[in-house]
């Protein structure tokens, strides 16, 4: 039996890529799409909804969310309330929101996934960076994205820093008496690590994790040149969450 999928934010670039992926997979069935600004009632024969409240009694298994940080939390909560296992690529969640959604998913006996990045290479980058941080505590992150991205730093950069912080010796990167001649020049501070965000047209999603040590350096980098790079992870997420009973944060938990 096919997994019935709703895609919220289907008009965006990630939403469109997800729609095409679902439509071409015989194990998946795209049963509805959601966008508050869509004027048509159907898209390729699939019903279009403008208000998520109208989906409250809809029959579906998985809610895929590529919307905006402003509505991602309430969308994920709505999905869990109505029996849809959420697969969320929208970023901007706080740690408190993630913890609350995990707990709520357990009470609903539903699986779910919030993933800062669905590219398998990005997941591997985070794992490699975590291993390296044990031996190279001096580290900075540079994340680069298209200029339409609304949150900074990226969810991937934050997740990378969180994972490294669990392993890394907590030290302040840079000179103790350094002075920023322009505010923000050294980037965001996460447990002594610096995170720098670049936003430029032409980019998709890229990240470097740069480690330094006496007389040597190590650079890890991942590049997504096309949004199709995320679809393997989205597909995996859809097929895995229906087997689970708790929401997880990070694609690595499903690998």
Swiss-Prot record:
<dbReference type="GO" id="GO:0050661">
    <property type="term" value="F:NADP binding"/>
</dbReference>
<feature type="binding site">
    <location>
        <begin position="115"/>
        <end position="118"/>
    </location>
    <ligand>
        <name>NAD(+)</name>
    </ligand>
</feature>
<dbReference type="GO" id="GO:0019877">
    <property type="term" value="P:diaminopimelate biosynthetic process"/>
</dbReference>
<dbReference type="InterPro" id="IPR000846">
    <property type="entry name" value="DapB_N"/>
</dbReference>
<feature type="binding site">
    <location>
        <begin position="89"/>
        <end position="91"/>
    </location>
    <ligand>
        <name>NAD(+)</name>
    </ligand>
</feature>
<keyword id="KW-0028">Amino-acid biosynthesis</keyword>
<protein>
    <recommendedName>
        <fullName>4-hydroxy-tetrahydrodipicolinate reductase</fullName>
        <ecNumber>1.17.1.8</ecNumber>
    </recommendedName>
</protein>
<keyword id="KW-0521">NADP</keyword>
<keyword id="KW-0457">Lysine biosynthesis</keyword>
<feature type="active site" description="Proton donor">
    <location>
        <position position="149"/>
    </location>
</feature>
<dbReference type="GO" id="GO:0005829">
    <property type="term" value="C:cytosol"/>
</dbReference>
<dbReference type="GO" id="GO:0016726">
    <property type="term" value="F:oxidoreductase activity, acting on CH or CH2 groups, NAD or NADP as acceptor"/>
</dbReference>
<dbReference type="InterPro" id="IPR023940">
    <property type="entry name" value="DHDPR_bac"/>
</dbReference>
<dbReference type="InterPro" id="IPR022664">
    <property type="entry name" value="DapB_N_CS"/>
</dbReference>
<feature type="binding site">
    <location>
        <position position="35"/>
    </location>
    <ligand>
        <name>NAD(+)</name>
    </ligand>
</feature>
<feature type="active site" description="Proton donor/acceptor">
    <location>
        <position position="145"/>
    </location>
</feature>
<dbReference type="Pfam" id="PF01113">
    <property type="entry name" value="DapB_N"/>
</dbReference>
<dbReference type="Pfam" id="PF05173">
    <property type="entry name" value="DapB_C"/>
</dbReference>
<dbReference type="InterPro" id="IPR022663">
    <property type="entry name" value="DapB_C"/>
</dbReference>
<keyword id="KW-0520">NAD</keyword>
<dbReference type="InterPro" id="IPR036291">
    <property type="entry name" value="NAD(P)-bd_dom_sf"/>
</dbReference>
<keyword id="KW-0560">Oxidoreductase</keyword>
<comment type="pathway">
    <text>Amino-acid biosynthesis; L-lysine biosynthesis via DAP pathway; (S)-tetrahydrodipicolinate from L-aspartate: step 4/4.</text>
</comment>
<comment type="function">
    <text>Catalyzes the conversion of 4-hydroxy-tetrahydrodipicolinate (HTPA) to tetrahydrodipicolinate.</text>
</comment>
<keyword id="KW-0963">Cytoplasm</keyword>
<dbReference type="GO" id="GO:0008839">
    <property type="term" value="F:4-hydroxy-tetrahydrodipicolinate reductase"/>
</dbReference>
<feature type="binding site">
    <location>
        <begin position="9"/>
        <end position="14"/>
    </location>
    <ligand>
        <name>NAD(+)</name>
    </ligand>
</feature>
<dbReference type="GO" id="GO:0009089">
    <property type="term" value="P:lysine biosynthetic process via diaminopimelate"/>
</dbReference>
<feature type="binding site">
    <location>
        <position position="146"/>
    </location>
    <ligand>
        <name>(S)-2,3,4,5-tetrahydrodipicolinate</name>
    </ligand>
</feature>
<dbReference type="GO" id="GO:0051287">
    <property type="term" value="F:NAD binding"/>
</dbReference>
<feature type="binding site">
    <location>
        <begin position="155"/>
        <end position="156"/>
    </location>
    <ligand>
        <name>(S)-2,3,4,5-tetrahydrodipicolinate</name>
    </ligand>
</feature>
<comment type="similarity">
    <text>Belongs to the DapB family.</text>
</comment>
<keyword id="KW-0220">Diaminopimelate biosynthesis</keyword>
């Amino acid at each position: 039996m096919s997994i019935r999928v709703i895609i919220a934010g289907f008009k965006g670039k990630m939403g469109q890529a997800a729609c095409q992926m679902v439509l071409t997979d015989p194990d998946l069935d795209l049963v509805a799409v959601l966008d508050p600004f869509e004027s048509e009632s159907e898209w390729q024969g699939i019903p279009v909804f403008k208000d998520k409240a109208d989906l409250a009694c809809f029959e579906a298994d998985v809610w895929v969310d590529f919307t905006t940080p402003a509505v991602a939390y309430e969308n994920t909560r709505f999905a869990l309330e109505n029996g849809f296992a959420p697969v969320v690529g929208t970023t901007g969640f706080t740690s408190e929101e993630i913890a609350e959604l995990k707990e709520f998913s357990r009470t609903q006996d539903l699986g779910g996934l919030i993933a800062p990045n669905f590219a398998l290479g990005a997941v591997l980058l985070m794992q490699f960076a975590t291993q390296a941080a044990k031996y190279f505590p001096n580290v900075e992150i540079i994340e680069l994205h298209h200029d339409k991205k609304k949150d900074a730093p990226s969810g991937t950069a934050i997740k990378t820093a969180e994972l490294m912080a669990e392993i890394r010796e907590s030290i302040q990167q840079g000179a103790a008496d350094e002075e920023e001649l322009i505010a923000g020049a050294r980037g965001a501070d996460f447990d002594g690590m610096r995170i720098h965000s670049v936003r430029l047209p032409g980019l998709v999603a890229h990240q470097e994790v740069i480690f330094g040590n006496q007389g040597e350096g190590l650079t890890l980098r991942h590049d997504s040149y096309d949004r199709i790079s995320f679809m393997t992870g989205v597909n995996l997420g859809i097929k895995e969450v229906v087997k689970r009973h708790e929401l997880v944060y990070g694609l690595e938990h499903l690998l």
